[in-house]
């Protein structure tokens, strides 16, 4: 009986232990089920996330493809822009060289213009000097003409005196013929008259020589005036030529200034175009 009780107690204890183990196993089973459900949820969530990631990956790959295409287009546009910039730089360099040559031509034209102006001033000064000389020569000619008139007047006066002396001599000769008896007393008078006649003759010859020299000087002055007049005409012609040269140079200077303004405007337009291009490139 005791053995049965012990056995029953042992069986009860074993039952209790079994119940405890069963409860424990049930609890573990619940926990395992919970973990399984949680794992399934996590797996579902992971699958959903993987699907989302795959979708995101497809979107990213598509966006990457578009970005690569856009980048290639940008690279191509950048290469074209760099080529255009290089071409524009070459054009700018050529324009700068043209501008330098234009400035050199402008400086040369300015120098030539200054030289031509100086030559024109010198020609004007020479013309004024020649005019003054011409006026001085005209004054000298007037003085010579006055002297010539005076010499002619003296010659005419000498001729008149000579005629008067000749008339007196004729009268004396007539008186001498009528008064031969008074020849001795009138001899001294005749000598005086002959001396006066000789003096008058010498004066007349001197006046004739003076008149001839005056005529020679007059011819020389006329020739000198003619030479000076020719020189004056030549100087005026050179002055007119210099003035025409100055006008041509001035036209050349105006043309170069217009060309320089056009080049500057072209340079500004190119610079603005480059700035706009750089701004567009910076915007990308």
Swiss-Prot record:
One GO term (biological process): locomotion
Tissues in which the protein is found: Expressed in muscle (at protein level). Expressed in abdominal muscle.
Entry keyword Repeat: yes
Chain positions with N-acetylmethionine modification: 1
Coiled coil: 1-273
Keyword terms of this UniProt record: Acetylation, Allergen, Coiled coil, Muscle protein, Repeat
GO molecular function, one term: protein homodimerization activity
PROSITE patterns, sorted: TROPOMYOSIN
Keyword check for Protease: no
Region of interest: Disordered: 1-42
Compositional bias of kind Basic and acidic residues: 12-38
Complexes and interactors: Homodimer.
Matching PANTHER family: TROPOMYOSIN
Annotated family: Belongs to the tropomyosin family.
Record text about domains: The molecule is in a coiled coil structure that is formed by 2 polypeptide chains. The sequence exhibits a prominent seven-residues periodicity.
Functional summary from the UniProt entry: Tropomyosin, in association with the troponin complex, plays a central role in the calcium dependent regulation of muscle contraction.
UniProt-recorded name of the protein: Tropomyosin Mac r 1.0101
Species for this entry: Macrobrachium rosenbergii (Giant fresh water prawn)
